[in-house]
């Protein structure tokens, strides 16, 4: 496949020469999100009949054949548009996404939200998973902080109650997946849903005081330190410590570092100290020639050398937290721009040799780019 022009090729207005190279790249990143990426989901990426975003677009901006719509994808897009309510059409789109989250995915019989619906709007995967519910809490908390509407507040409250009453275990952790009727599927806890639940709790605390959420968050972090952190390296493992064939993902180390380091509540906790060590280890063994690798074994051996745009964005966001990392940050922002962003959108993945290995653009990715940009601007 012919190499598509990157953002550097032009297709965007050029910032003032007075800006530093870093500021110029940041300007282009901000402009690319606003002028190219967000409009994809206002135009070709939007199914007006379903009032939902398509799951993904191809490189020519055509929707992929519809197999499903996920509640998590709807919630991520709600965050995206509620983050830019001042932009034309964003407030209306956020309101529509919020309505769709409630009408398409909510389980009126058992409570909670289905994982996905089919092309006709009928429940597809009827299980209740923590990852989905964490993003519903996150998106509703953020949206409520923007609009202050009573229905948004009640939806947030309902989602928090479901998490506390259905997913919570007696060890401070949360089940990854439950049946439609909340039956036990034996999933146990997994790292990624716990991380996004922590993110959702932090977003809730950013918009309101909530002692129950604060207790749940600190308890979750204590349990993760106990059961998921590798004591030798400080990295957060994907499965509980001692699980067979365990691994870690450098992108998640960088994502965790940002969440903990930016929280006055969680900064300087034992988990923060571990993840700071884990960051250094992940950077040493999991970043090669500027590319964040997908998966490594506990021993540091590469399992999957795929380079994913979300992991690159999380690395950039984390690097912005330390003035001493400014030079590395500038290099990594360049990597994000030149290897992943294109005039038409973005490359989702490259393989270990640097070749584009995934040619579609999922509706869930702009969430990572928007949170990365927000972190850089803050």
Report residues per predicted region:
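Glycan-recognition and catalytic cores of secretory/periplasmic carbohydrate-active enzymes
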Residues: 4-378
